[in-house]
């Protein structure tokens, strides 16, 4: 592949030189600063008790999809869907917010990178991706919404005005946009979200774009486009992947994964898929379920098609049966390759679950999950995720408690010293699995329903056991993250749940139960299972079984305004559970996009 890059480099460089005569400017000049009133609202206003302290969010207003995260010349860039005019989704106002960081934890806000100012995007600059071109020049591919009445979506490109600017503060849109117009066989409102581009063995660039082909009732498709110059794109005859049952998919993401024990950086790519000998992950966000699904499989880099490798209980042709990156309240995830540390990093949008009126009153809405490292599990069937190591720099006071403690049936033990801003790691040991309840096969494809019917307050045999977080002193409010173990075909099935039914005393809040199965052999693990939970006021991210199953939740306890939250270990099963490891840390506040007024 590297031998083919000079052809693409020469052609792309030629077209970049022509930009100065055909630019549509995107205004962006300085750090976005808060007025004194705005800064006061962020620090002291309504809802400050639930505002995250170390998760990524703008100082104010609405954000949704992560767009074009990248590492460039020593700086991390985060672009995101942003409404500069308020704390609600207004599709015609959507811009690309832009922040920069040296460590993926602390962020400085810049002015918006892309605003809906041109004929090819004047009803919204929607989601897309970043690609580092030969010569080190980044490019942004994004969806432009050009007709709100007819809902026409097209694909555009933008480049930095000054590539030598280390912060890439200003971006320009060539007047030759759109680079990909709406296809004749795709409805106007179903063509969006171009991926990071990659170069095939033939020297041509490729991107994938989500579409519904064949009309309003058409087939959910991930289309492939090819180009030699990053300007003129031609659609491939075959889609990368189709799913008739899915309706409409969004925000596709295709990337290679190294076999277990091999660093991803040795695959020899920096921005997209590698050769057909390497296994890949395809992620699709399904609009009618608002969930992200992925499969490990084979990408044919000649035909530009993807074949999922799925278990017998899953359907390769229906992506809604695939595994999920997160079984909680996240959507529109986007990954990038971090060349500085040879790792793939994943972001995802965690929307609010509160009422829109409360979002508006607070003045902000939407956060991103903590950035997660992603790699292929040893079983070759699933990926694992873990908070990037930089999150650990926020750890301050360390608490070691309950080590070796036995939690009897109905027991609740407090972890003293941590509350609403914490990182908790625990390993639970089950002395005996003999009493595990029998698993019913019809539970397999709906773990969330199983969690809803068997919440933390429902006693079981082996479980529920786990953590109670964001808990009030009287336990009337709490969020439960727990496991249940079932007997299944001479082995055991582990269910992980996050139960929000008692997360708040308020009624106008979405309080579901989330759930996913943890694909491990708990007997081979010595009858143990691990849980790591990051607590950040209204955000609770949990990683079960070493990151094989992840659940993110948004919670809004009334007691949070009093800043008096607690963490407990609990066991509501009939058998005892041993806490063989428990470490917890208070986490410091990160500096995230808050700049005091002038």
Swiss-Prot record:
GO terms for biological process: carbohydrate metabolic process. Keywords: Disulfide bond, Glycoprotein, Glycosidase, Hydrolase, Signal. GO terms for molecular function: fructan beta-(2,6)-fructosidase activity. Glycans are attached at residues 93, 288, 351, 572. Not inhibited by sucrose. It comes from the Eukaryota. Transmembrane segments: none annotated. CDD domains: GH32_Fruct1-like. The active site is at 65. Expressed in leaves, stems, roots and inflorescences. Maximum expression is detected in stems, particularly the penultimate internode. Pfam families: Glyco_hydro_32C (PF08244), Glyco_hydro_32N (PF00251). Residues 1-30 form the signal peptide. Disulfide bonds join 451-497. Its EC number is 3.2.1.154. It catalyses: Hydrolysis of terminal, non-reducing (2->6)-linked beta-D-fructofuranose residues in fructans. It is an enzyme of class 3 (hydrolase). Hydrolyzes levan-type beta-(2->6)-linked fructans to fructose, but not inulin-type beta-(2->1)-linked fructans. Belongs to the glycosyl hydrolase 32 family. This is Fructan 6-exohydrolase. It comes from Triticum aestivum (Wheat).
């Amino acid at each position: 592949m590297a031998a083919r890059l000079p052809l693409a480099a020469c052609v792309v460089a030629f077209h970049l030189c022509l930009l100065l005569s055909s630019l549509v400017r995107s205004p962006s000049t300085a750090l976005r600063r808060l007025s004194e009133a705005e800064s006061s609202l962020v620090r002291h206003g309504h809802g400050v008790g639930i505002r995250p302290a170390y998760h990524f969010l703008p100082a104010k207003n609405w954000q949704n999809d992560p767009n074009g995260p990248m590492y460039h010349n020593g700086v991390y860039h985060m672009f995101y869907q942003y409404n500069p005019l308020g704390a609600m989704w207004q599709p015609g106002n959507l811009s690309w917010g832009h922040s920069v960081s040296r460590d993926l934890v602390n962020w400085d806000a810049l002015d918006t990178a892309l605003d809906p100012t041109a004929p090819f995007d004047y009803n919204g600059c929607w989601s897309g991706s970043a690609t580092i071109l030969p010569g080190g020049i980044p490019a942004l591919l994004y969806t432009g919404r050009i007709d709100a009445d007819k809902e026409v979506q097209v694909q555009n490109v933008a480049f930095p005005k000054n590539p030598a600017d280390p912060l890439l503060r200003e971006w320009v849109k060539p007047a030759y946009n759109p680079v990909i117009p709406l296809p004749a066989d795709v409805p106007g409102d179903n063509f969006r979200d171009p991926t990071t581009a990659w170069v095939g063995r033939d020297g041509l660039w490729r991107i994938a774009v989500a579409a519904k082909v064949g009309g309003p009732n058409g087939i959910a498709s991930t289309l492939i486009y090819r180009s030699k110059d990053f300007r003129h794109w031609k659609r491939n005859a075959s889609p990368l992947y189709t799913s008739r049952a899915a309706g409409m998919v969004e925000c596709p993401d295709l990337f290679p994964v190294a076999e277990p024990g091999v660093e991803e950086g040795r695959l020899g790519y920096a921005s997209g898929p590698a050769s057909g000998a390497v296994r890949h992950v395809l992620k699709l966000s399904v609009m009618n379920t608002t969930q992200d699904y992925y499969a490990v499989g084979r990408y044919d880099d000649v035909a530009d098609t993807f074949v999922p490798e799925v278990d017998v209980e899953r359907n390769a042709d229906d992506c809604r049966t695939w595994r999920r990156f997160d079984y909680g309240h996240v959507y529109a995830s986007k990954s990038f390759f971090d060349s500085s540390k040879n790792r793939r990093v994943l972001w995802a949008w965690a929307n609010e679950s509160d009422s829109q009126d409360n979002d508006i009153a607070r003045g902000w809405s939407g956060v991103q999950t903590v950035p997660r490292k992603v790699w292929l599990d040893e079983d070759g069937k699933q990926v694992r995720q873990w908070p990037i190591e930089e999150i650990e720099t926020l750890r301050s006071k360390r608490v070691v408690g309950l080590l070796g403690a036995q939690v009897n049936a109905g027991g609740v033990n407090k972890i003293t010293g941590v509350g609403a801003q914490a990182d908790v790691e625990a390993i639970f040991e089950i002395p005996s699995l003999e009493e595990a309840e029998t698993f019913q096969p019809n539970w397999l494809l709906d773990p969330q329903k199983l969690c809803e019917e068997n919440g933390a307050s429902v006693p079981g045999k082996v479980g529920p056991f786990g953590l109670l977080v964001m808990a009030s002193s009287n336990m009337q409010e709490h969020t439960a993250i727990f496991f249940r173990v079932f007997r299944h075909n001479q082995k055991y099935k582990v269910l992980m749940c996050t139960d929000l039914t008692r997360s708040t005393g308020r009624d106008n809040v979405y309080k579901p139960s989330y759930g996913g199965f943890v694909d491990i052999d708990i007997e081979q693990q010595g009858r143990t299972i691990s849980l790591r939970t990051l607590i950040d006021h209204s955000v609770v991210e949990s990683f079960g079984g070493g990151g094989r199953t992840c659940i993110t939740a948004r919670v809004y306890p009334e007691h949070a305004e009093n800043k008096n939250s607690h963490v407990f270990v609990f066991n509501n099963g009939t058998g005892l559970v041993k806490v063989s490891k428990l470490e917890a840390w208070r986490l410091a506040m990160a500096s995230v996009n808050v700049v005091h007024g002038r």
